[in-house]
Amino acid sequence: MKRFLLASICWAVACLPLFAQQISKEELLFLTPEWKGERFPDGRPKVSDALLKRMRRVTHEEAWAVMKGQNYKYQYAEGWQVINPDSVLVGRALTATFMPGRPDVHRVIDKKGHEKDGRVKSQNAWPIDMLVKGDVYVVNQFGAHKDGPTIGDNLGNSIYAKTGNGIVYEGAIRDIAGLKEIGGFTSFYRSYHPSHHLNNPDGELNTTLVGINQPTLIGGVMVMAGDIVLGRDGAVTFIPPHLVEKVVTTSEIVRLRDMFGHERLRQQKYTPGQIDNRWTDDIEKDFSQWLNAHINELPVPKEQIQEYLKKRTW
């Protein structure tokens, strides 16, 4: 009997996020303890706009190397179709998780949303109403294709107006021509279908919203609300907020060292072997002098270069 009771309690605790639907501030704080910076009122980590701007130049390789070194091995998702494939998508994740529609669950979620939580319209609009500038809407639509799309050009325009960004969508979208016309709606999605989702629990139903800002699964990655989305070159990397500054700073240092190395190779001052291997003290000193001489011309903020130079001994 005690074993049964314990199992029941564990099951209930495990299901709390589902019944609560939107994650509580307390739970979000519990799941993101390594983030010590600013947060939104609901507890979502708020990485600064300045870091988001610098993140736009980071490559997947640079982000991957830093995160792998911190034992974060499953942060990269590939195999997407892309709107604006030559653009870069960067922002703070706001997540939504859908499951195949189930009438009884759908009804109680609708009832709670409309009567207790102040939600309006259908469930697919609820997370969108929460978006703010700099967010990226990240959706687990369980790969739904036909009758699966919850986003077309109407909601796409609303998302872009609120965030200035596109989306990451584990499923099919619709109105692809209209979404492309938005211009800056750089998005990563699995497929396209002209149909739309069905959300009537008393009629046709195929999708139910079960989580807002809960941990969700996107392409083999556990995505947390507040993770930084880096979408470029056909793939998406999700960076935990407490690693963002390290990723950005490392990327900038690598970028500067590459620029210096390439310039010196063109000048034939050093051999490829000297540049590819650990730099000697003389090369490091030359690099510091080069940074000082070009500090106003480099694609890294002057303040960041000055901070970097303070820590160098050459």
Regions found by a protein language model. Give the residues of each.
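Feature captures the catalytic cores and cofactor-binding loops of soluble hydro-lyases/lyases
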Residues: 54-62, 66-225, 238-282, 293-304, ...
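Buried hydrophobic positions in well-ordered alpha/beta secondary-structure cores of metabolic enzymes
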Residues: 43, 159, 227-229
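Structural motif
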Residues: 44, 215, 234-236
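Positively charged n-region of N-terminal signal peptides that target proteins for export
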Residues: 1-4
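N-terminal pre-domain segments of enzymes
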Residues: 21-64
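Bacterial N-terminal signal peptides
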Residues: 7-17
